[in-house]
């Protein structure tokens, strides 16, 4: 039996072993997935990987939690395996990755909670803690510290307001976002509006937790004129970001949108999206239609998508490498 089938067989047995009385165990999952991708002639990924890639994934997640009065604890343990073509990531002349790694690592996160078991050009296996946080929930206040996930913005596919760790727009599995090490706070007002704030600390390439690697953000979510709106003020990697967004009903459909302004190297950069969604139940089944337009102000104006051209645009390259942008 090859290593990949042996690992899959082990994953299949783990829920049986974990189904006993394990203190704090609050469920989990096993997911197996095959992903085939093809890249058009003008894609930067085609020069990297070729016309097509094929990958297999296995993901085990065990969720642990506990609470006492207003305090709580969460820890999610993961084992992730990947076999296929997308592991052999290209680097430039300085050893810089042109794409974020396909398997998660904690090289730049504040805490290193990932253990790489196997890593080569055809297979990878890691175990890690994707959630590890303590929290307090009051009548109008929520506080959490540790590894966790936060989602902001009104995008359904793309999301310029979600710059902490957004999903890849082409992601097949969007049940869990990768956790980031942060302090999160929320204060609920009597009107139903709320304030949310985050402080995310990361490390640089030397392993130092510096101010240049931080994200500090404050967002207000309010209601008015039969609509909801968001106001955002943030500093992300020493760049200021202002954002405005909202949603409103449009007949039986929902109209959403976000606009962000970023004080980048060469001046202010605007990114925006607007989407429309409509849901109904044909023959008793749920169905949804989504239309979304996204404008990436950091994108290239020309259709030259070679790695060399992308790396020449430092604002774009840094966001691609950090996993903030994917296109």
Model-assigned labels for residue ranges:
Residues 21-30, 69-75, 139-141, 181, ...:
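Outer-envelope beta-barrel architecture signal
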Residues 52-60, 125-130, 137, 177-181, ...:
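Residues that define the transmembrane beta-barrel architecture of outer-membrane proteins
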Residues 60-66, 131-137, 183-187, 218-222, ...:
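Residues on the lipid-exposed face of transmembrane beta-strands in outer-membrane beta-barrel proteins
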Residues 253-327:
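Detector for outer-membrane/organellar transmembrane beta-barrel domains
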